[in-house]
Amino acid sequence: MTEPFRAEQRVLYGDTDSMGVAYYANYLRWFEIGRTELFRRVGSTYRRLEEQGCFLPVYEAYCRYHNPARYDDIIRIETTFSFAGKARLRFDYVLLHKDNGAVLAEGYTVHVCTDKDGKVLKPPVELKQLLKEMEEMARSEGSKK
């Protein structure tokens, strides 16, 4: 069993719309926070990858909304590295209300490895190693349960 990486984010007043719930696009931003923090957890950053000429633009994004997040809620962001292809990688996400565990949203993003000009590249060795570490971390965390 694998375990997702977990991060938390508080819903700020500016994250909400006139109905008092989190604006829909913010869920994708929270996906990004989860993904970014997962990279940090395995010892790297997007900046470091970009400095080495590897960019990971979003190629596809999907979000299924279940329950609204509201101002001052704390969201638990669960992120899992899902797969890597020749030049693509996918991350899966679940956003949960920290206090009651309600699923707020689920989704995924697919990224393509490119150079700074947008030319598709095979994932570089460092990225492959980071993805391997993400998989190992998820398996290790899952075996502790």
Spans of model-derived segments:
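Hydrophobic residues in beta-strands and at strand termini
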Residues: 9-13, 65, 113
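Solvent-exposed, charged/polar functional surfaces in cytosolic regulatory/catalytic domains
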Residues: 37, 64, 133, 137
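Short, flexible helix/strand-to-coil boundary loops that buttress conserved ligand/catalytic motifs
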Residues: 23, 42-43, 135
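HotDog/MaoC-like acyl-thioester-processing domains
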Residues: 3-7, 70-71, 81-145
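Catalytic strand-loop segment that frames the active site of acyl-thioester-processing enzymes
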Residues: 1-38
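Hydrophobic beta-strand-centered segment that forms part of the acyl-chain substrate-binding groove
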Residues: 38-89
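Residue-level recognition of specific faces of alpha-helices
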Residues: 27-30, 55-57, 92
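A broad, structural micro-motif
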Residues: 22, 56-58, 104
